[in-house]
């Protein structure tokens, strides 16, 4: 741990994984470490075993997925889980990992979110993937699946997503009764069944049923283009969002907008694990690996969100 304990308040211990050794994860971590290792608000704990990391580097080519990389990432996540249970870290920030590397290592998971659920012996449906850009917060109703599986998966998951997301908004963001907007699946939210029937056949019914719990103010399903265009305008004009949380029906319904608006400032947050895990909102950057041009802004955004969640939002970065 690189101690930066000059603050009167005990610094947070934040654990970092490098991500895929063949990508930009190691580069952005060491840049972040160099710039912020003396910050009094947090200690930086590198979870990866550097000896093992260097051994992996000798077996791979930068910019290419490899089973060696996938295996290294798995062991880093296992070690992170162990360190949390030993009370050695307070938060986890993960570097980007190639899903192909995981699969080449025999780890048939669609991403680190699902892998962390497995490590914690949780059903992946019990954890949720949030994306946070200031007060523009989004949760994905379906995650890393093909588009032809979205409708069935949405029908299965939507009620649980609403429950899990509401719990996360209450416990993490301290919003007692969040105002939630749900995007429809089809263009124009199906136009009352003319374009698609998911909204009329099950989405509206599920939202109405969830509303009876009176634990959140749930609205929708709305036409996604109008809903997210308004959210984008609010963000660009520094206006407070009308909703505390937006629910996107599928991955690419919202991620292009979040990444376009926020660049590296958007943060991927996993809710439902025994600890809070955050990650940069970008991939492994295989195309620029080893060129020393990658930005560590995503790791800075993760750390800023941790400070905000832990009620240290006024903390300054050295």
Residue ranges and their predicted role:
Residues 1-115, 155-267, 273-318:
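Contiguous, glycine/small-aliphatic-enriched amphipathic segments in soluble metabolic enzymes
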């Amino acid at each position: 741990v690189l101690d930066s304990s000059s603050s009167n308040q005990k610094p947070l211990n934040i654990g970092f994984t490098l991500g895929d050794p063949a990508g930009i994860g190691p580069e952005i971590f060491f840049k972040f470490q160099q710039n912020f290792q003396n910050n009094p608000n947090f200690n930086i704990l590198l979870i990866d075993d550097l000896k093992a990391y260097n051994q992996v580097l000798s077996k791979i080519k930068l910019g290419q997925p490899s089973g060696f990389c996938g295996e290294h990432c798995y062991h880093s996540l296992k070690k992170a889980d162990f360190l949390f249970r030993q009370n050695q870290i307070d938060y986890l920030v993960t570097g980007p990992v190639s899903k192909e590397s995981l699969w080449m290592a025999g780890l048939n998971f669609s991403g680190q979110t699902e892998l962390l659920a497995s490590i914690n012996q949780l059903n992946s449906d019990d954890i949720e993937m949030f994306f946070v850009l200031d007060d523009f917060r989004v949760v994905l109703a379906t995650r890393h699946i093909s588009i032809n599986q979205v409708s069935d998966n949405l029908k299965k998951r939507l009620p649980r997503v609403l429950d899990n997301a509401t719990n996360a908004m209450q416990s993490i963001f301290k919003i007692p009764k969040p105002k939630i907007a749900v995007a429809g699946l089809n263009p124009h939210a199906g136009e009352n069944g003319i374009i698609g029937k998911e909204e009329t056949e099950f989405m509206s019914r599920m939202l109405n049923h969830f509303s009876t719990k009176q634990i959140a103010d749930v609205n929708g399903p709305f036409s996604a283009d109008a809903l997210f265009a308004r959210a984008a305008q609010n963000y660009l004009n520094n206006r407070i969002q009308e909703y505390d949380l937006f629910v996107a029906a599928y991955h690419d319904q919202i991620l292009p907008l979040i990444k376009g608006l926020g660049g590296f400032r958007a943060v991927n947050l996993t809710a439902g694990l025994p600890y809070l895990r955050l990650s940069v909102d970008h991939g492994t950057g295989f195309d620029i690996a080893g060129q020393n041009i990658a930005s560590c802004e995503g790791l800075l955004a993760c750390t800023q969100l941790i400070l905000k969640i832990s009620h240290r939002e006024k903390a300054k970065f050295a």
